[in-house]
Amino acid sequence: MRRNLMFVLLGAAIGATSLHYAVKAWATPASGFTAITLAKGTVGAFEVFNHFIPPNVTDDDGEKKIWLSWQKTRGRSDLYVQSNTWQATQPGLPVASTGWHSHPGHSLIIVTAGTLTNYEGDDPTCTPHVYSAGMAFVDPGGGHAHIIRNEGSVVAQNIAVQLIPAGQPRRIDVSPAPGNCPF
C-alpha cells in the first residue's frame, strides 16, 4: 500500500512538472524587445477632473469645443515610466515583438522612434494599428490582450506611462496566444 502511494505521488509530481513546462511552451514570449523602467512611484487613491475650452475652436455647429479628462482610482496605484525598444526586422529572423500580454491598468504610449504595429487579441480580423514616431495611443489594460511588433527595418522605441493597482505585476503574459493572428 505504501509503495503504491509512493508511485501515485511520483506520478503526480511528474505530471505537475510536465504541465508547468507545457504551459510555459504555450506562452508567447517577447522577442527582440527590451523594457527598462525609468521611474516607479506609488500614489494613494485620487480623483482628478480637468476641462479646458480652447480659444477660437468650435465644432461644425459653431459651439465651442471642450476638452475633458477624468481619472479616478480606488486604493493605491503604482505609476511606471517605461522605455521600450524593439530591434529592427532582419531577413530570416523573427519580427521583434512584446509577445501577447496584458496589463492590469491602462498605458499612455508615445512612439519616439521607428514604427510600431499593435494588434488586439479580441479583433477577429487581426487589423494592424500602425503608429510612427510622434504618434501616441492608449492601451486600455484590464486584461486586454495585445501584441506590439516592429515590422520595420529600423529600431523602434516608445515611452509608456502605466497606472496599475499597487503591488501587481506590470505585465501579464497571455498564454496561449489568442489565435486571431497568423503569428
Whereabouts are the PLM-identified features?
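A short, N-terminal "cap"/entry segment at the start of jelly-roll beta-barrel domains
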Residues: 4-7, 18-82, 129-130, 175-183
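Short acidic-glycine-tyrosine-enriched beta hairpin
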Residues: 121-143
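Glycine- and acidic-residue-biased ligand/ion/polar-headgroup-sensing regions
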Residues: 103-123, 135
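A short beta-loop-beta micro-motif enriched in histidine and acidic residues
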Residues: 74-77, 86-110
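N-terminal post-signal-peptidase region of extra-cytosolic proteins
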Residues: 84-88, 93-96, 120, 124, ...
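Ligand-binding loop in jelly-roll beta-barrel domains
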Residues: 132, 141-169
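Short histidine-centered beta-strand/loop micro-motifs
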Residues: 96-103, 120, 129, 149-150
